[in-house]
């Protein structure tokens, strides 16, 4: 059974259509990467699914149509991480993660001791447990992103929507973050949709890739099963001529590497 089914989704800004008639489904325990050139609608797609933009079409999460969900119900079902945190006040890391429980709390209700324990445990899972009392504003951009990831994890939502989570991360943290996502979706029978700029990261951590171009879905591929001969033309259509090769790590794992060809040759 599909966890998420998106049907004929169209959305845009200020009267301009950015995505049109996009349909796909997402299975449980999977990560779906969204690739495409700047301006093709990656962020628009994520925001439309999160019900943050007016749109036509439908997004069904299990038995719930997200268009019909209340803000609280939507917040319980979906976790959304934008490109910028939106946090401008001084808060401890623990308090930021505790914000993830807000959909479960009434207006004047405080987090329970159990919630505080779960928030701390989740901070530990992303490597920030020792900094729980530090000021969020004093973190590096990469550390802020990890803290926001913990905030999204803590409620164990079924669907995570992440807009360029790797953009502020260094090489090591990019791969650690995708590893954390993979662990989360497997453990919680959940799924994640992720917009990415790094195709090599997407090729090695995403179960499915949606390739966007000119308002629509250009194609889908499964990096772990689609033949390289079929992936190369699709990826070349958005990145220019590329070639893919497979390398083995020291532990014997296979990795896909994308190489940009010199268009001048």
Question: Over which residues does each language-model region extend?
Answer:
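The feature captures the beta-strand-to-loop junction immediately N-terminal to the Walker
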Residues: 35-37
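Helix-to-loop junction immediately C-terminal to a conserved catalytic motif
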Residues: 50
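Conserved ABC ATPase "signature" region
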Residues: 98, 113-131, 156
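Conserved ABC ATPase signature
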Residues: 135-139
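ABC ATPase nucleotide-binding domains
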Residues: 231-265
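Catalytic Walker B motif of ABC-type/P-loop ATPase nucleotide-binding domains
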Residues: 160-164
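Conserved ABC transporter NBD signature motif
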Residues: 57-65, 74
